[in-house]
């Protein structure tokens, strides 16, 4: 399937970013403000609900985004992120070779997938000989392209959440003294899954999805669990070694131990977390449980105008901000 996939050319740092998960369209429109930041002009979420496809397309056309170049971001549930040993082939043959190599690792036939590849880490630190392979079902790509058509937008690039998260981590690191040290981010991408990424030198070195079970974000953990325990209430939380809550801590510990063994020259500087309305609570709890400096992933200094709206809508829109910082000009 021939598509405007992750690309190798620099992309303009302004415009429109959209994401479609089959139920809701999230969008962010922004432009540079001349001070190294992106001014968010508007953002929002349109849910299809009970609308027919025709009714929903009409509603999307009414958003007034016609003619704008759009970048698409796929959410983690819409693709697989794999890591493989780099095939010993010329760069122009990497995708073909990777397609053959991942055939036993993907959940459907490789002919039904669109692939792209990305080097792991930064070779200035150490050559890894590894590749990330992004595998997205053609059906997911077609669906999001149909929504873009309903918006009457031209899609320039299709990007993914992992790389958007990398961009945000790197931008925050630059504002805090540089990207030479490693930074981790733990982001709740759904009610039951966290995405852990570790970056350095503006590159993605490690990514992992941690499944936590349904209802993790509604469970009593962190401050809620501690408060309930102080009042003598029975709770499912970290103080009582709840399996669901402790799984996140255990899996992060495992990933950080692996990181220390694999990349001893890149000391982990900080961990940032994002969990919507419970971000501060998650940061406090994980900082205590992990023994690391854990801070909220705070984007407002980089994106003035990203304020207002419901917490649910903001949670769907904020990852799109990372696509606005995209500058994929490397070649494999």
Predicted feature locations:
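Hydrophobic/aromatic-enriched cytosolic interaction surfaces used to assemble or bind macromolecules
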Residues: 1-332
